[in-house]
Amino acid sequence: MGRARRFQWPLLLLWAAAAGPGTGQEVQTENVTVAEGGVAEITCRLHQYDGSIVVIQNPARQTLFFNGTRALKDERFQLEEFSPRRVRIRLSDARLEDEGGYFCQLYTEDTHHQIATLTVLVAPENPVVEVREQAVEGGEVELSCLVPRSRPAAVLRWYRDRKELKGVSSGQENGKVWSVASTVRFRVDRKDDGGIVICEAQNQALPSGHSKQTQYVLDVQYSPTARIHASQAVVREGDTLVLTCAVTGNPRPNQIRWNRGNESLPERAEAVGETLTLPGLVSADNGTYTCEAANKHGHARALYVLVVYDPGAVVEAQTSVPYAIVGGILALLVFLIICVLVGMVWCSVRQKGSYLTHEASGLDEQGEAREAFLNGGDGHKRKEEFFI
């Protein structure tokens, strides 16, 4: 009897040790990642919950909810679910200062707690693109792209004409966020004026496949060009002619000058900006007219030779010159085609003649052989006598 009492307490302790872990309450959490300004859900999963006190605290150890009752007056935190299986809270408009570990505490005979780590990412805003100095044709342009806030550090890329450009990037950490910059250099010409260069920023805070872009329109300065267009190709006495000086340049020339060689313009002429109007033309108006334009990068000059014909004169318009060129090209093509056809016919005739010659030669040899076979060697002798 005494021996039985001796083993009673050890058996009870062994049963408690085996049964305790299997019947105890537990709490589990999961880490959460959210973009700045987004919505995060923090969940505490309960196992074998028996109605004990559940407390949720923020990273500063301030109590947010006590058994489903709000304890901190921050309306961004809302209790979404409180059940024997889980406690779920919702955080809207997430901020960097909300980042950290959120405590899920279960108060029983032994306090249990787990930490859910909230990570807040910062998506980049549209990059800021600037040019270091004014671009001029024949030189280089340097562009810079800046993203002042991002987390993690944004990756910057340059694109031009759907091709990626190689830039040089640098970053600086400011507290929890990064400031990232990138520069790119390339040569430019006047044809690049108005072209588009894109700076693109990406990081994990943006949805997959999304990016923030800024388009920069190139401003390339270059010297002017000038060309005169006439309102008609052939002018006669009494006609009105309008000459237009088509000017390009960056910056665009703001003044155009009209001249007529070493002579002054006719008194009837009206020069207004890019146009020169010559009404009531006479032969005395003949001459070389010029328009000139300039900017800080150079100047341009265009010429137009005016010939005024009599009213009854028969002349060919200047626009007929392109047709003459086209006609000459067509004539040359026809000549080449004829040459090719003649060559093909000549080769065909020559090949056929060679075939007939060989065929006739073969017939002679066969006839001679047949005659020799029939007459024995007489044929050979007769040939000798014939030749003698």
From Swiss-Prot:
Belongs to the nectin family. It comes from Mus musculus (Mouse). This is Cell adhesion molecule 4. Monomer and homodimer. GO terms for biological process: cell adhesion; negative regulation of peptidyl-threonine phosphorylation; negative regulation of peptidyl-tyrosine phosphorylation; negative regulation of protein phosphorylation; negative regulation of vascular endothelial growth factor receptor signaling pathway; negative regulation of vascular endothelial growth factor signaling pathway; regulation of cell motility; regulation of cell population proliferation. It is a single-pass type I membrane protein. Residues 346-388 are cytoplasmic. Disulfide bonds join 44-104, 145-199, 245-291. N-glycosylated. Glycans are attached at residues 31, 67, 286. CDD domains: IgI_2_Necl-4. Residues 21-119 form the Ig-like V-type domain. Its main location: membrane. Keywords: Cell adhesion, Disulfide bond, Glycoprotein, Immunoglobulin domain, Membrane, Phosphoprotein, Repeat, Signal, Transmembrane, Transmembrane helix, Tumor suppressor. The modification Phosphoserine is found at residue 361. Residues 124-219, 224-307 form the Ig-like C2-type domain. One of its GO terms (molecular function) is vascular endothelial growth factor receptor 1 binding. The keyword Cytoplasm does not apply. Residues 25-324 are extracellular. Expressed in the brain and several organs including the kidney and liver. PROSITE patterns: IG_LIKE.
